[in-house]
UniProtKB/Swiss-Prot annotation:
Classification via SMART domains: CLIP (SM00680), Tryp_SPc (SM00020)
Localization in the cell: Secreted
Positions of glycan attachment: 141
Domain observations: The clip domain consists of 35-55 residues which are 'knitted' together usually by 3 conserved disulfide bonds forming a clip-like compact structure.
Gene: Sp7
Organism: Drosophila melanogaster (Fruit fly)
Clip domain: residues covered: 30-84
Disruption of the gene: reported phenotype: RNAi-mediated knockdown is semi-pupal lethal, with 50% of pupae dying at the late pupal stage or during eclosion. Adults display impaired melanization at the site of septic infection (septic injury) using either Gram-negative or Gram-positive bacteria. Reduced survival, PPO1 activity and induction of the antimicrobial peptide Drs following septic injury using the fungus B.bassiana.
The protein's name: Serine protease 7
InterPro entries: CLIP (IPR022700), CLIP_sf (IPR038565), Peptidase_S1_PA (IPR009003), Peptidase_S1_PA_chymotrypsin (IPR043504), Peptidase_S1A (IPR001314), Ser/Thr_Proteases_Immune/Dev (IPR051487), Trypsin_dom (IPR001254), TRYPSIN_HIS (IPR018114)
UniProt record similarity statement: Belongs to the peptidase S1 family. CLIP subfamily.
Stretches assigned to the Peptidase S1 domain: 137-390
GO MF entry, a single one: serine-type endopeptidase activity
Length: 391
């Protein structure tokens, strides 16, 4: 018979660690579990309630999710740590699916940023922005196979029928992808082609099935676009690229799995200030120092620039920025490039979930010293997003 530690180790290695969402942890090991019950951050080996779940002959998908979402930081004893209470599974409120939405679309019916009414169309942690625990990363800028699993690739078809993956985007719920307006209308239509398809669950575009060692993801999803909605004030002829944001409604609901999850958006209750010098993360399949495009999903940590400095810099190119545009980066050969357009600019919240703060918009060449990239600030468009999405 296998020892308790071996059984737990096998379970964690195959089912838990790569796909975990961390819970918010306060000082001295206090935490809240997925049912929002206060507990202690302990080694799972010292938490009998959750250890007993793992030791069952069959662990249901719901219990696996509860275990994943129970992990915490800064615990006591041997890793991994869990927020330990007497709970063994989701409470009745968590286990019950959301009620069907009412038909009204007014912002008042949704509460702040759509958190009430309409079936809570924008998810909140732990149902968005999961953190990867996989350590299977071979190159410095490659992501883990399950990292940033809301990333989307946009596919275009030109007038000769040739297909090309160009822009990026991010899944924000099971029906919508957030991207840049310039990835939908304007020069992209003549230079790349007509936007036709969204690809989800991608890691390495050169392979049909993506594996790192013995970890393989599920097949990618190819979804059509039922409707593309560009911000009404976006003007593709305006080189300032103000309001460069768009929503893609997919032709069917996405069945979420460990490799396809939505990112969190900065709702009023979770919104944080963005400070100069703070490191944010951009991800995509854009140009690298050695190739026009990367086949493997990349990540890069970039500092936020002072907005006034950035605005003055771009004014010398007769480009005039407004407060809803973020400036990030500006380091030599460290930038979001080409194919990253429309992709997310992200950061970890206090609850350890990932939030999308920006959409890749434009820059003055790529990776040019002293020239930051410009991103559409998502928080400034939350009202528009909430008013646009529907069940």
């Amino acid at each position: 018979m296998k020892s308790t530690r071996k059984v737990v180790g096998i379970f964690l290695a195959t089912c838990l660690l790569p796909f975990t969402v961390l819970q918010n942890v306060a000082a001295q090991g206090s935490c809240r579990n997925p049912n929002q019950k206060q507990g202690q951050c302990l080694s799972i080996y010292d938490c009998q309630s959750l250890l007993s779940v793992i030791q069952q002959s069959y662990v249901s998908p719901e219990d696996r999710t509860f275990l994943r979402n129970s992990q915490c930081l800064d615990g006591v004893g041997r890793q991994p740590y869990v927020c330990c209470t007497s709970d063994r599974s989701f409470g009745s409120q968590e286990a019950t699916s959301a009620a069907p939405p009412p038909t009204t679309t007014s912002s008042s019916s949704r509460g702040q940023d759509g958190q009430a009414g309409l079936g809570n169309l924008l998810p909140s942690p732990p149902k968005c922005g999961p953190h990867s625990f996989s350590n299977k990363v071979y190159n410095g800028n490659d992501t883990a196979i399950d990292e940033f699993n809301w990333m989307a690739l946009l596919e275009y078809v030109d007038n000769r029928g040739r297909r090309e993956l160009s822009c990026g985007g991010s899944l924000i719920n099971n029906r919508y992808v957030l991207t840049a307006a310039h990835c939908v209308i304007g020069a992209v239509e003549t230079e790349v082609g007509h936007l036709t398809t969204v690809r989800l669950g991608e890691y390495d575009t050169s392979k049909d099935v993506d594996c790192i060692d013995d970890i393989c993801n599920q097949p990618i999803l190819q979804l059509g676009i039922e409707q593309a909605t560009v911000h009404p004030q976006y003007d593709p002829a305006n080189k300032n690229r103000i309001h460069d944001i768009a929503l893609l409604r997919l032709d069917r609901p996405v069945v979420l799995n460990e490799y396809i999850q939505p990112v969190c958006l900065p709702l009023v209750s979770t919104r944080m200030a963005i400070n100069t010098g703070e490191l944010l993360v951009v991800s995509g399949w854009g140009r690298t120092t050695t190739a026009r495009k990367s086949t493997i999903k990349q990540r890069l940590d970039l500092p936020v620039n002072d907005h006034d400095y950035c605005a003055r810099k771009f004014a010398t190119r007769n480009i005039h920025l407004i407060s809803s545009q973020l400036c990030v980066g500006g380091e030599f050969y460290r930038d979001s490039c080409d194919g990253d357009s429309g992709g997310p600019l992200m950061r970890r919240g206090f609850d350890q979930a990932w939030y999308q703060e920006g959409v890749v918009s434009f820059g003055n060449r790529c990776g040019l010293e002293g020239w930051p990239g410009v991103y559409t600030r998502v928080a400034d468009y939350m009202d528009w997003i909430v008013e646009t999405i529907r069940p």
